[in-house]
Amino acid sequence: MQESINGNLSEERISGTQQSETRNGAPVNGSSEQQGTSGTEPNQLRFQSSVSDSERERQKAIDLEHRRAAFARHFGCAPGSEKHVENYSSFDEKDTRVQLAEFYRFNDGHFKKWGYF
């Protein structure tokens, strides 16, 4: 019984030493034996879009709707075209860049909240 346990332990030690020789399927010494058929390493990072195209379009439509509402609040009328809405910059709380003051009303709630002007 102990021999089989010792035998399993020795097999685990052997497999543990073999695993230390490779990292993520690529040899430690950097030889090109593990390269795929396309010539790139199999453990190379590949770009995967975290946001699908439909999700990106939905986000853009939501942003455009927010800009349209901000345009209507600022000028008191509906925009003439989508081009005017896209060109009108709306206030972004997360944007830390310096923003032009002439696009915003000075009594706007964002400025009171964050202490601008």
Swiss-Prot record:
A GO term for molecular function: peptidase activity
Subcellular location: Host cytoplasm
UniProt keyword terms in alphabetical order: Autocatalytic cleavage, Host cytoplasm, Hydrolase, Protease, Viral capsid assembly, Viral release from host cell
Pfam families linked to this entry: Phage_B
Site, as annotated: Cleavage: 74-75, 90-91, 105-106
Enzyme Commission code: 3.4.-.-
Disordered as annotated region, ranges: 1-60
Gene3D superfamilies, per the entry: Scaffolding protein gpD of bacteriophage procapsid
Biological-process GO terms, alphabetical: proteolysis; viral capsid assembly
GO-annotated cellular components: host cell cytoplasm
Record PTM: The proteolytic cleavage of the internal scaffolding protein B releases the scaffold protein in order to continue virion assembly.
Biased composition (Polar residues): 1-52
Subunit organization: Component of the procapsid complex composed of 60 copies of the internally located B, 240 copies of the external scaffolding protein D, 60 copies of each of the viral structural proteins F and G proteins, and 12 copies of H.
Family label: Belongs to the microviridae B protein family.
Function text: Participates in the assembly of the viral procapsid in the cytoplasm. Forms first a 12S pre-assembly complex with protein H, and F and G pentamers, then twelve 12S complexes are joined by the D protein to form the procapsid. Internal scaffold protein B is released from the procapsid upon genome packaging. Autoproteolytic activity cleaves protein B and probably facilitates its removal through the pores of the procapsid.
Name recorded for this polypeptide: Internal scaffolding protein B
Gene: B
